[in-house]
C-alpha cells in the first residue's frame, strides 16, 4: 500500500515536470485513490483493536450489495419514465456505468459461504450478482472474469461430490447460453476488429489500440519516463490533449478503458513492478486462506481482478473498488493473524 501511495505522489511531480501541469491538478483526480489507500493503516489498526468486526463488515456488504442491485435493476426498468440514479448510461443499450464493487463482491462472498457451509441460501447472492452482470453492467470482460473466478472456487472444493459436478455442469450451460446471446455477438465483433480489422469506423477496441501505441511511444521518450511513467494527466489541463487524451475521430483516448496499460503509462515500469509484487502477495495470502481456513472468496476475487487487468483497473479508477482492495487486504491479514494466534 505504501508503494502505491508513493507512486501516486511521483506521478503528480512527473506530470508537472513533463508538461507543466500544476501539482494540484495532478493530485485532484487521484485524491480519492490516495486517501482510501491511506485509510488502510487506520482500518487495519481498528480491526486489530477489535473496534471493527470483520464479519459484521461482510454481512453489511451482502446487504448493501443486494440493495444496490435492486435499485439499479429498478432504474434500468424505469429508465424511460424516471431517472433516480444519476450515473452515465450507454446510448444504444440500457447499460448503467456504476461503481460496482458491492454488486460484484456479493457473488464471491455468497459462493464462498455456500462452498464452506453447504447452505443453498447463499446461492441467492450469486444469482443477484449475475443479474447485475447481465442486465445492469453488461460488461463482457467483467462477466467472463467473474464466471472464471467462480469456476476456480468450485474446482478447488475439497470434496469431490455430485454437488460439485452439478455446479460445473451449470457453469458449462451458462457459458453455452452466453455464446448464443447478443453479448457474445458484440464480443465477437470486438475480436474481429482487434485481429482482422473487418469493421468500419472507430470503436472502443480501435481507440484502445491507438491509446496503447501512443502510451508506449511516450514511455520510450526517455529513461525517466520509462521508469517513472508520464505522470497522472488531468483532463482539465490543456496540455493533456496532446498526450493522454488525444482525439481519435469523434472520440478520444483515455485512461479508464486501458487497464494496466494506462497504469504503466502513468507510473512507468516502477509501477508495473509494484503491481506485480502486490498481486503476488495477494495470491499468496489468498492461497494460504484457502489451504488453512477453507475460505474461498479471496482467491476467486483476485483471479477475477487479474483477468480484468487487460482492459479495466477498477481498483485504480473507482473509489468503491479501491476501498474493496483495502478491505480484501485487511480481511486476509486479520484472518491469517488469527490463525497464527491460535497456533501460539
Please place each PLM-identified region on the residue numbering:
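Membrane-interface micro-motifs in multi-pass membrane enzymes
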Residues: 27-32, 88-105, 139, 256-259, ...
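Transmembrane signal-anchor hairpin modules in multi-pass inner-membrane enzymes, especially those
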Residues: 1-10, 48, 52-59, 113-121, ...
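A membrane-periplasm/extracellular boundary helix in multi-pass inner-membrane enzymes
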Residues: 136-137, 157-199, 219-221
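Long extracytoplasmic/lumenal interhelical loops at the membrane interface
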Residues: 202-267
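Alpha-helical transmembrane segments of multi-pass inner-membrane proteins
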Residues: 55-81, 94-156
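Aromatic-anchored transmembrane helix interface
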Residues: 1-12, 20-45, 60
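Hydrophobic transmembrane alpha-helices and their immediate junctions
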Residues: 119, 163-164, 266-308
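Transmembrane alpha-helices of multi-pass inner-membrane enzymes
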Residues: 108-109, 300-344
Amino acid at each position: 500500500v505504501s508503494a502505491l501511495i508513493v507512486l501516486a505522489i511521483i506521478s503528480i511531480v512527473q506530470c508537472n515536470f513533463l508538461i507543466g501541469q500544476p501539482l494540484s491538478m495532478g493530485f485532484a483526480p487521484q485524491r480519492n485513490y490516495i486517501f482510501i489507500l491511506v485509510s488502510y493503516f487506520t482500518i487495519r489498526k481498528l480491526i486489530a483493536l477489535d473496534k471493527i468486526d470483520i464479519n459484521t463488515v461482510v454481512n453489511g456488504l451482502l446487504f448493501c450489495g443486494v440493495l444496490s442491485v435492486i435499485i439499479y435493476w429498478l432504474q434500468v426498468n424505469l429508465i424511460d419514465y424516471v431517472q433516480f440514479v444519476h450515473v452515465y448510461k450507454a446510448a444504444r443499450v440500457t447499460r448503467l456505468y456504476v461503481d460496482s464493487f458491492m454488486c460484484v463482491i456479493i457473488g464471491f462472498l455468497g459462493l464462498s459461504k455456500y462452498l464452506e457451509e453447504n447452505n443453498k441460501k447463499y446461492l441467492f447472492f450469486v444469482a443477484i450478482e449475475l443479474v447485475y452482470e447481465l442486465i445492469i453492467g453488461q460488461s463482457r470482460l467483467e462477466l467472463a472474469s467473474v464466471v472464471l473466478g467462480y469456476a476456480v472456487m468450485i474446482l478447488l472444493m475439497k470434496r469431490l461430490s455430485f454437488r460439485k459436478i452439478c455446479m460445473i455442469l451449470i457453469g458449462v450451460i451458462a457459458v453455452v447460453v452466453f455464446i448464443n446471446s447478443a453479448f457474445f455477438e458484440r464480443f465477437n465483433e470486438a475480436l474481429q476488429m482487434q485481429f482482422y480489422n473487418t469493421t468500419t469506423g472507430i470503436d472502443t477496441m480501435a481507440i484502445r489500440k491507438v491509446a496503447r501505441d501512443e502510451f508506449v511511444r511516450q514511455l520510450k521518450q526517455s529513461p525517466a519516463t520509462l521508469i517513472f511513467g508520464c505522470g497522472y494527466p488531468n483532463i482539465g489541463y490543456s496540455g493533456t490533449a496532446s498526450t493522454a487524451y488525444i482525439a481519435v475521430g469523434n472520440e478520444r483516448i483515455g485512461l479508464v478503458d486501458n487497464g494496466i496499460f494506462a497504469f504503466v503509462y502513468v507510473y512507468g515500469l516502477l509501477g508495473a513492478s509494484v503491481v506485480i509484487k502486490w498481486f503476488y502477495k495477494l495470491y499468496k495470502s489468498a492461497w494460504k486462506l484457502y489451504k488453512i481456513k477453507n475460505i474461498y472468496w479471496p482467491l476467486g476475487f483476485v483471479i477475477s481482478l487479474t483477468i480484468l487487468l487487460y482492459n479495466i483497473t477498477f481498483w485504480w479508477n473507482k473509489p468503491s473498488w479501491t476501498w474493496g482492495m483495502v478491505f480484501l487486504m485487511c480481511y486476509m491479514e486479520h484472518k491469517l493473524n488469527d490463525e497464527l494466534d491460535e497456533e501460539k
